[in-house]
Every structure is written in C-alpha cells, then in structure tokens.
Amino acid sequence: MALRPNDVTLRLTPPLAAAARRNRRAAAGGVRVYAVASGAVSTKVENKKPFAPPREVHVQVTHSMPPQKIEIFKSLDDWARDNILSHLKPVEKCWQPQDFLPDPASDGFHDEVKELRERAKEIPDDYFVCLVGDMITEEALPTYQTMLNTLDGVRDETGASPTAWAVWTRAWTAEENRHGDLLNKYLYLTGRVDMRQIEKTIQYLIGSGMDPRTENNPYLGFIYTSFQERATFISHGNTARHAKDFGDLKLAQICGIIASDEKRHETAYTKIVEKLFEIDPDGTVLAFADMMKKKISMPAHLMFDGEDDKLFEHFSMVAQRLGVYTAKDYADILEFLVSRWKISDLTGLSSEGNKAQDYLCTLAARIRRLDERAQSRAKKAGTLPFSWVYGREVQL
C-alpha cells in the first residue's frame, strides 16, 4: 500500500465539506484524466466514459528498454530457474484460506462464525478501512499479472510458456491469489463491512488498471515490484500487530501469514535486481533513480467506490494515522533497498550514473525531512464517511 512521499505532505488539509463532495460527485459524469509527461506541463484530457472513475494517468511511455538489453533477460532464464523459482512453494505445501476460516462442513460452523463476529465487534472502523483497502489491493491481482506480462524479455508469450520468467509470474500470481480470497472471506463473515460497496470498488479498480510507469521495461518493473512487495509486507505486518492489540489473535494470524508470503516474494524480486546490478550497474542505477523520481505509487492508486473520487487518498490518510503504512515506511523501504543493493559501493559508473547514485543515497533523508516539516505544519484532519463501513464517519 505504497504512499508516495508527497501524498502525505499534500493530504494534510481537512477534507471537503459534504456539500462540496456531493457537487463533485454530481459533476463526475464526464471523467477527467490528467496526462502528465515527466518534466512537462500538465495536459488535461477529457474522458467521456461515465463508468470509469476520475483518475490521474500519465502519458504512457512504452518499450523504453533498448532492444539489445532483451538478450540480458533471455540469457538469465537458467539463472532465474535456479535462483528465483526456489522462492516459490509447492502447492501441496502452501497454506490455503480455509485453514484459517470456520469449516462450513463442521457441526460447529455456526458457533465458530459467532465467535469470529464477537471478536470483530471489538475492532474499530478505522482499522477495518485499512484492512478493506489492503484486501481490495490484493483482489486486483489480474491487473498485476497483466502488468508483469507487459515487460519486454520476461513476459509470458503464450499463456503457458515454459520459460522461468513466465513460470514465476504464473506461480507468483497463484500464491498471491490466496491473500485476497482469505481477507475477503474473513471480512464477509464479520458482518462489519458493506460487501457490495467493497465488491464494486474491486470491479472499478480492475477495470481502471494501474499506472506504474514501468514502460514495458523489466529494469523498472522489477524495481517497482521489489519496493511494492516490501511495502505490502510492512502493511500486513502492521495490521497483524493491530489485530493482536485488539485481542483478535486469529485475525493477527491471518495478516501475519500473508505478510510472510510478501516477504518471500520481496526476497525474489530484490534478488533479480541485485543480479541486474551485477551485470549492468550503470543501467540499473539509472532505472532505480528514474522510478524514485517518478515516485512509487500503490498498485491500487486508481481505486474508486462509485462515490468518492479521492478514495485512495482518504484510505491512505487513515493508514498513515494508524501507522499501518506511512511516509516513514516509504523512506525506510528506500533506505533498505539502497543498502540491500549496495548503491553507495557502486564504481565505474557514467557521469549520469554517479548523479543517480548520489540522488538515491540522499533521498531517504530528504523524504524524512519533508515529512517532519509537513507533520509540524499539519492541521488535524476531519472525519469522512466511508462506504466500506456503511457510510460511518472515520477520522482521517
């Protein structure tokens, strides 16, 4: 659930008044899409599709990786088979959602559901907003598999390709699919959330896609996934700790087991980028700096529930306040990756590579300073109704 650093600094004003929100929603029939080229002046593009949410989409740069570099990834297929597929688990050894949920075939099913619902009554709405947001993010998995299959040199060319890259993408997707299934079923059983509004949000999100700005470029794509897997590991880990604090040990176990998967996937993606630094340090450090200058966005940044066209922003504000995922986490992830990939130790770089190295090694500290300054100036945000919790007001 990756917030961008400026998301936090720009979200600290109180939310719009209810009347203003209603007016905005009423005017949302003609959807506005903002196309922004890197370093260019914003250009407003009118999108007349009434079923799509208002959203910001950048000018789509495609196939930015030089064709000769595709050969790097083809040559790494055997390496990926030996070093990346080992981070997958055989299906028979994987946990399944049913392992953590009441058994509908059991005579004690109704009692187990009743106990689950009793525990859920002790959990506040703002936590459920974060948990729902995490679940919706996981449920947009078709988009993420699609994104991986846009990457030149590693995509699944047939839908059943035997290359190590294609095997990884399909098996990673299959493992991730359990996360949304488990959280979805748990939330349904609690009775605390409006499942129809949540299901609408999922449909809107998958229909909207995502805008990671990875340009069909596996250098950019694997840097993005390295960052995102660590972000989801942190987010699910924090929801697990909160659930434990609320006394729901089963929910803590659910969030914790998902976090452990994300950690394993993070290890695989960061290992891919580590290999790229070994083979092509200059090209990889330039790609890393490029992604950080664009700012890493959460995969679900285009979420919409049919009512709130700033839903992702408001959800992120709640997550920031509760400490589920924060600007500090964003800076910590960056710092972790800079250390993991030994950016400060790179030598023999071009002049542009040296500039990228300096930028990356100082960026985390800059982000922290900006966040501290913003927090010191921030006014207390108000409350906002979330459709996911039946329109109840939640503190931003």
UniProtKB/Swiss-Prot annotation:
Metabolic or biological pathway, per its Swiss-Prot or TrEMBL entry: Lipid metabolism; fatty acid metabolism
GO biological process: defense response; fatty acid biosynthetic process; fatty acid metabolic process
Claim: Lipid biosynthesis is one of the keywords in the record: yes
Cellular compartments per GO CC: chloroplast
Name of one Pfam family that matches: FA_desaturase_2
GO molecular function, one term: stearoyl-[ACP] desaturase activity
Binding site for Fe cation 1: 138, 176, 179, 262
Coiled coil: none
Mutant lacking the gene: phenotype: Increased level of stearate (18:0) and reduced level of oleic acid (18:1) in leaves. Spontaneous lesion formation in leaf blades, retarded growth, slight increase in endogenous free salicylic acid (SA) levels and SA/benzothiadiazole (BTH)-specific inducible genes. Enhanced resistance to the blast fungus Magnaporthe grisea and leaf-blight bacteria Xanthomonas oryzae pv. oryzae.
Cofactor: Fe(2+)
Note describing how the cofactor binds: Binds 2 Fe(2+) ions per subunit.
Protein's cellular compartments: Plastid, Chloroplast
Transit peptide endpoints, chain numbering: 1-32
SUPFAM superfamilies tied to this protein: Ferritin-like
Binding-site residues for Fe cation 2, renumbered to this chain: 176, 229, 262, 265
EC main group: oxidoreductase
Source organism, top-level taxon: Eukaryota
Enzyme Commission numbers on file: 1.14.19.2
Catalytic activity reported: octadecanoyl-[ACP] + 2 reduced [2Fe-2S]-[ferredoxin] + O2 + 2 H(+) = (9Z)-octadecenoyl-[ACP] + 2 oxidized [2Fe-2S]-[ferredoxin] + 2 H2O
Function in brief: Converts stearoyl-ACP to oleoyl-ACP by introduction of a cis double bond between carbons 9 and 10 of the acyl chain. Required for the repression of the salicylic acid (SA) signaling pathway.
Quaternary state and interactors: Homodimer.
Protein name as catalogued: Stearoyl-[acyl-carrier-protein] 9-desaturase 2, chloroplastic
